[in-house]
Amino acid sequence: MRNSNRGPAFLILFATLMAAAGDGVSIVAFPWLVLQREGSAGQASIVASATMLPLLFATLVAGTAVDYFGRRRVSMVADALSGAAVAGVPLVAWGYGGDAVNVLVLAVLAALAAAFGPAGMTARDSMLPEAAARAGWSLDRINGAYEAILNLAFIVGPAIGGLMIATVGGITTMWITATAFGLSILAIAALQLEGAGKPHHTSRPQGLVSGIAEGLRFVWNLRVLRTLGMIDLTVTALYLPMESVLFPKYFTDHQQPVQLGWALMAIAGGGLVGALGYAVLAIRVPRRVTMSTAVLTLGLASMVIAFLPPLPVIMVLCAVVGLVYGPIQPIYNYVIQTRAAQHLRGRVVGVMTSLAYAAGPLGLLLAGPLTDAAGLHATFLALALPIVCTGLVAIRLPALRELDLAPQADIDRPVGSAQ
């Protein structure tokens, strides 16, 4: 296979790196701006929740939009709108003064940026099988590379975010995010790939509601996808407040923005190694074992972090969490790609992503006030224990055995025929 055939894969991976790196900067910058002004974990959780509230609906709409308008077009438009939203922070400060960048403004702009992000991510995710075919790669290889790129982005993003906050301030740092989205747009603009353009009218969704319903019906009828979605929903709701509220609160209290970036980098670094090793791991270790081990390890590591050990210990635990969780999203992608028809893929990706975000706002809104009232130690424990229980339950779930079985039916079957 000629190297030129790898061009589409590399363009998609580069665009993913840029967009996700911009998001990584925002993960640090938005909560830091709030904590710097208000000093309250509860206020920071409001902004973090604002980024989550649009995601459930946005991911559902994104999947239908991708299957209707086309993957390439949706990716570029979504990145343009996300970039404009984050650029609004320094623009508001420039036009009305730094005091105008209050909690309400940050919450609105964070929500807008988050609302458009899922469409770009879904569009790029949906192009992976065709890019793999052009490059001569297996699905496991491109899924592992894609997840590794996401983790690499969240190494680069938070690190740049923490360093830029420490040097030029949180408001100016937002220009980094806008620039990253611009580079993502340029990469996808250069992409030429079958299936990336506007779909034929016979295969497009008939409407927004019917398109969402088709995706939901497919996921619900396929037991393995339904089970994976429920596990992801639970774990995300419990873990997300740790990364979005508890870690920023801990490091803000200690005036250590750079260390916050390092902690998030440790998670992403472990995830990078885990994702890169997924193609080899999938041959030797059952996917069901990988899944259960990841959830259990996440819960146990979070329980140790609850005792607020020294920073090097926290870093090691974060790296371990990332390492065991690195293969999880490639497993999700593999199941979707081998069971969903090409014309339905965007909707299925959107539904699976939306399930992960469904309980996010509730977890974030509870974590902030609980942290202010009971402290970081108690809140970490309150979130970690249910994750451990979820991992114990996952060990015995019969549906997860299907992760290691070949698909029983052709992926071009009708939407309602999943079993």
Swiss-Prot record:
Induction: Induced by rifampicin and ofloxacin. The keyword Ligase does not apply. Pfam families: MFS_1. Inhibited by piperine, verapamil and verapamil analogs. It comes from the Bacteria. The keyword Mitochondrion does not apply. One of its GO terms (biological process) is response to antibiotic. The chain crosses the membrane at residues 7-29, 44-66, 73-95, 100-122, 149-171, 175-197, 218-240, 260-282, 289-308, 313-335, 348-370, 375-397. Belongs to the major facilitator superfamily. Drug:H(+) antiporter-3 (DHA3) (TC 2.A.1.21) family. PANTHER family: ENTEROBACTIN EXPORTER ENTS, INTEGRAL MEMBRANE EFFLUX PROTEIN-RELATED. This is Multidrug efflux pump Tap. It comes from Mycobacterium tuberculosis (strain ATCC 25618 / H37Rv).
